[in-house]
Amino acid sequence: MELTPRDKDKLMLFTAGLLAERRKAKGLKLNYPEAIALITCAIMEGAREGRTVAEMMALGREMLTRDDVMEGIAEMIQDVQVEATFPDGTKLVTVHNPIV
């Protein structure tokens, strides 16, 4: 099976997102890469399911709170940008201040 570099990146993000999801479910506080991966993975999957850009932006802001991440992580993540594939094409989704 041949994967393009973009497909490899998507697969790596998905794997990191699953790991972050499991750690969050265990009650562990997420670090920077885990928080980014969780938000990114959810946006990519939602886009693939046919949701709108606005829905994905809202989802990105609702996924994590300060209690879900390690100290200082919320301040480190000001924006998350994801290039996601929607039914009508690839679009850039930007989530400002995703951790409340």
UniProtKB/Swiss-Prot annotation:
It catalyses: urea + 2 H2O + H(+) = hydrogencarbonate + 2 NH4(+). The keyword Cytoplasm applies. Pathway: Nitrogen metabolism; urea degradation; CO(2) and NH(3) from urea (urease route): step 1/1. CDD domains: Urease_gamma. Pfam families: Urease_gamma (PF00547). GO terms for molecular function: nickel cation binding; urease activity. Keywords: Cytoplasm, Hydrolase. GO terms for biological process: urea catabolic process. NCBIfam families: PRK13241.1, urease_gam. This is Urease subunit gamma. It comes from Pseudoalteromonas translucida (strain TAC 125).
